[in-house]
Amino acid sequence: MRIDYSEQMVTWEWDGCVIKIELPDIIHAEYNKNENIVIVYSGENFVSKIIFYFSLEGKLLGQQNLPEGTVDWNHNGQHQIVFHHLHHLRFSPKYQRIFSIFRSSSDFGLPSELEIYNLEGEKIDQIESPAGFTMLYISEISKKKLRIVCEALKDDCFDKSGRSDFYFNLDLE
């Protein structure tokens, strides 16, 4: 799907209609084919401050305010979650989940944890990083699993080829 955007407008075609949405300070816009949504990044000097999530019909599904550490969405009413020391967030309307990777402080040497919320705003799971590693970001979401990129916190956790990163597969069922 082709997405066109300028500093103040994002447009795309869906089901024979042209969808036009005005937003301030657009940095980038993209179609996420796995979620079947349009994601728009807004901010200043190429630094994102707000990420907007739209349905293909142009309906605002949710938005993430990066400086404030919040995500807001509408699902059977308005919801908001405030995150402290958030490192990575994935908003997944397709699987009706919000996945957040966070740390207990701003120290990047500490292992991160994953929290999973449903769209009612209820925390449904919390998972620690594998021993000796920290979770960096979610690379893939499916109905059955998450694929998370992890990084070693210490040299003794590197593999025999000297790699510090690996994929951690987390079963969701």
Residue map of PLM features:
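Structural motif
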Residues: 46-61, 70-72, 106-115, 156-168
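Beta-strand C-termini and the immediately following turn/loop, strongest in propeller blades
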Residues: 2-6, 41-44, 100-111, 148-158
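Short, ordered coil/turn segments that flank beta-strands lining enzyme active or ligand-binding pockets
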Residues: 56, 119-120, 173
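Acidic, proline/glycine-rich low-complexity IDRs
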Residues: 125-129, 133-173
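Aromatic (tryptophan-biased) beta-strands that constitute blades/sheets of beta-rich domains
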Residues: 10-12, 17-23, 62, 67-83, ...
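Charged linear interaction tracts used for macromolecular binding and regulation
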Residues: 80-105, 110-113, 117
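Repeated scaffold domains used in trafficking and secretory/extracellular systems
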Residues: 1-8, 20-43, 49, 80-95, ...
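Acidic (E/D-rich), amphipathic helical modules within compact regulatory domains
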Residues: 58-64, 98-100
